[in-house]
Amino acid sequence: MDLFNNLALGFATATSLENLFFCLIGVLLGTLIGVLPGIGATATIAMLLPITFQLEPVSSLIMLAGIYYGAQYGGSTTAILINMPGESSSAVTAIDGYQMARKGRAGAALAIAAIGSFFAGTVSTFLVAIFAPPLTQIALQFGAAEYFSLMVVGLVSSIALAHGSIVKALAMVALGLLLGLVGTDIYTGTPRFTLGIREYADGLNFVAVAVGVFGIAEILRNLENEKTRSVLMAKVSELMPSREDFKAMVGPVLRGTAIGSILGILPGGGAILAAFASYTVEKKVSKHPEEFGHGAVAGVAGPESANNAGAQTSFIPLLTLGIPANPVMALMIGAMIIQGIVPGPNVATEQPALFWGIIASMWIGNLMLVILNLPLIGLWVKLLTIPYYVLFPIIMAFCSIGVYSVNSNVYDLYAVAFFGLIGYALLKLRCEPAPLLLGFVLGPLLEENLRRAMILSRGDPMTFVQRPISAALLFLAALVLVVVFLPSVKKKREQVFVEED
């Protein structure tokens, strides 16, 4: 009964005119970002963080959430029409979606992707509503030692699921943790790593770091290597899939939804891995595996359902534990902190309208996407003709104005420029910046809970292994590190990310 009352509160919050407007803005902007290859939801949300400072907390988080799952929808459009995924999670969709388009079935492929995405998004949103409250109650029982261990698990999982070298991912997490130390020590009041600059006494501005590492770095990378884009079909027709298509997509959509719902919770690239896992499963269970790569319906329906389900369930650890499952969720935590909200299990009890409003808005956003996306395909295709050299200077100007408006601090602009160059250098060195951001976000929380646990135990480090939940979480973190270095697992992991590239 409580679930229905809470959902009623959520829908009452999400259906206000203001929140419906920002939900619509979010999903449309997300679709646009998904359609334009090279920008991405992470960079977009990072660049929009300054704007959220001026909005109501519920409205801003609803808009950012809409951008995230809207980008999953939009990414499939370019994957199918021009064989260039707008989002990395749509890379698998391009394999069979583009082949369907070449056979004159672009409309059916887009409709299959949209229907699968809507079903998966709807189901996974209800899973969030069902599982978030009990997990929140469990999290309320956690002490400092348990939170420290939980964050260690989150960081280790992000390393295991990061692209490329595990050693590089470890280095990125370490760098993020170090950046999180900049500022004033919360217990002694001693400045740390501020280089004598008073403006950094409160630490590095999260918005400046995120905009630099993700936004500016991505812009520099795309300007250096602009891809040629030629749309395959000027006119997309026959959007309604045939009866055979519907029969062929039922199983893949159900399996993809299940796979994505589970993998989306894991820290790291849950939606991306879910798409690849779904494609692998569909190929193995298919009676005609030879059709994959040549326009198989299951090759579009399964991965699209999986990546959208993964995008939705990644909100579970964010809303219940305050732990980001991916870089976008880390940015969402940043948006909550900007609004004065402490991420974690207390959000559900202290601000139920915010908690349930976000969940309800996800269902509304999915409905908006499936209604709006197919009629607007012509517009999205035309937007693909905008050159990067026109688009990106405008974006950079808005970023600079937005970052400065948060604190009116010119040093934040220096930080954006510096971290933009750092982020670009990391991309050139094939170091994924996502673990860095997770380390930067979790670093202060990790330190605070570590020191609090040590104070409560009077300096006894055994407190972390004497408390059952904390010990189990630390054992899990150690197990993940050991498993990921096993030769067979390491080889399979490298194979997945090579296929994605």
Model-based region annotation:
Residues Y69-G74, I115-L127, L179, A301-F315, ...:
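Membrane-embedded alpha-helical segments of transport systems
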